[in-house]
């Protein structure tokens, strides 16, 4: 067989693979990935975490207030926030611009280690999961995403509990300024509720691994379908269609994952805040699901969903794009 026939056969094989959804990573590329410097994923994750935290904080405050409001309604408190724009307007009117950045410190402290751990574990697992699932990229990416998500969630859950408490402080009434910063919040939660309270919402957070199990395999799949190149030439890359392909893959994968898994965020937020509901209801998943459905119906599990999409989709784009380009730059830097 001549070189032309070889090339045609290779192209046909590649096209057939793509059509069938088989995106097995070539052996040579596997070896290169396995020899990659672990510092690259860790530092890239930390940088993307810092950028994401600063971007999402105002949206996170609005989302958290809307999610928590459903629990306040169950305890017969008045409804203070109405819709996405109404929530922003109310926070700005009552608390000023600073109100939109409540919890920024724990958000930054949370995002940096979360994404640093997540991407380090995810990259590490992907190096070896392709050998375990050589013909199923979905299972390879999903198992890596779930493992990384579980480890980072358990490691950083206390920070997110603190962040939720700080974001819910309005300076008015029941949610007045009870906590005076990150360290003070940690101290008061441990003193008043015990260290166990720092792991409130861990079960629904772990159930939220479904989010990354959908998002990251879909993200990797879309990158391939859109023809995204893993080239490390950063200078020309950002001006090419490669950059647009990465943005589109980030957006679509996050929108799908968020739509499917949003109810777990509602439950996690409500388990993490303080309320007048008995602990047997608020701190346990099934009773909380029942009372949420009874009081608010199915819509209660999607309270603040529009705000969440406005927050998570741009955050996913910033996170993944900054991670990919940091990784490209650092790969050449550490060579």
From Swiss-Prot:
GO terms for molecular function: NAD transmembrane transporter activity. Keywords: Membrane, Mitochondrion, Mitochondrion inner membrane, Repeat, Transmembrane, Transmembrane helix, Transport. InterPro entries: Mit_carrier, Mitochondrial_sb/sol_carrier, Mt_carrier_dom_sf, SLC25A32-like. It is a multi-pass membrane protein. Present with 1630 molecules/cell in log phase SD medium. Belongs to the mitochondrial carrier (TC 2.A.29) family. This is Mitochondrial nicotinamide adenine dinucleotide transporter 2. It comes from Saccharomyces cerevisiae (strain ATCC 204508 / S288c).
